[in-house]
């Protein structure tokens, strides 16, 4: 990981030292590299003149760009962890029902106002069990719902591709998950004055609540729908200014 900015090396070093940043911060005098990649924000003036459009490039081990992600504004930015789909070491929860085991994790341990990070639900159906995917409209599909609150903006959840399953008792072909799968839901920390003030407090925390609703079936029986409450916790830090 590395970041590039038009700031001089001394400014970048002071910023990195103050924030505990260990990855390289690259100085781009005169925004030469930014201009070469056609990333210069030509509408930026005054103190912001020379800045690039906010974005992230993903490279493979050979240094080849494999994907990129750009933002509409500088204030709300996806975290590196959410872009690469990483899971932090701190597991925030584990739940088991009669049909599934669930683990809840996050892309980041620490977030700031404006950060767009991801919460994950890893779902493992038990032996012979399956749940219906969102594209199976004739039954109750698996659904993740994040509880809205004033500190976050909730984005749409993302589900992996499902598999086709033949339910022999009814001779029906259905779209299901019968193997472990992950649901990803991004949330953006609000930039409101209240949340910024809250982030300045020592040991400030942000709690995201939600629920997973599903109906599971085995090869013979469909069980009652279940709603499982879920919680994710991350530490909240103030913006660097």
Can you name each region flagged by the protein language model?
Residues 31-35, 164-165:
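A short acidic, often aromatic-flanked loop/helix-cap motif at beta-alpha or helix-coil junctions
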Residues 15, 37-40:
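Residue-level signal for well-ordered alpha-helical positions
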Residues 7, 30-31, 62, 149, ...:
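Solvent-exposed coil/turn segments that connect beta secondary-structure elements
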Residues 37, 68-69, 135, 228:
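Short hydrophobic alpha-helix segments
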Residues 1-24, 29-33:
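Structural microenvironment flanking redox-active thiols in thiol-disulfide oxidoreductases
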Residues 81-241:
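Extracellular/lumen-exposed scaffold segments
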Residues 20-24, 39-57:
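Structural micro-motif
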Residues 48-104:
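Thiol-/selenol-based redox modules, centered on thioredoxin-like
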